[in-house]
Amino acid sequence: YIVPSTGRAENMQPPQIEAEKRIRYYITSGGARVVDHSTGEIIHEEILTPEDSARMCRVFEGRNIYTEIAAGGKIYLEKAVADHLEQYPVPSHHVWFIEAGRQIVIDKPSRYFSENGIGIEKVNMYGIPAGLQQQIYDEVEHSGVAHITDPVGENMQFFPQGLDRTRGIRKL
């Protein structure tokens, strides 16, 4: 088998990857999930708890930041942002995904993940205003549950603290 190991969520794999029959397993979201694509079985998962997911959503929620939230193999967008995507810096290599309508739009991410008992795999934030960059970085880094893998800047992503891609590879 070919096993792609990527930062993308499962449903954000390009159609060319999904169509490749030799690809049975995905290592997704930087190692947060290992999935048997043919059966849907989750082989390995390192995610935030639903409560920690809700807390981390409050870091960006309502701040008009284009944010992709990966959870359960899917990408979620905050409705207030999704309703006006033309105003946000959607990465060019993600446009196909948005145009295909594969994202799930939710009103208030913190409430949604808490009420539905869903844990987050990772979060990508794009176009963070300069005045919020350090604050968001500090909030995530001092949360005790998540870690930003990028330097302070307009684009940052975070994962569950302690995530180790090699654990998923070894389990597979």
For the regions a language model picked out, list residue spans one by one.
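Active-site phosphate-binding/coordination module
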Residues: 1-91
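Conserved acidic, metal-coordinating active-site core of Asp-based
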Residues: 59, 63, 70-172
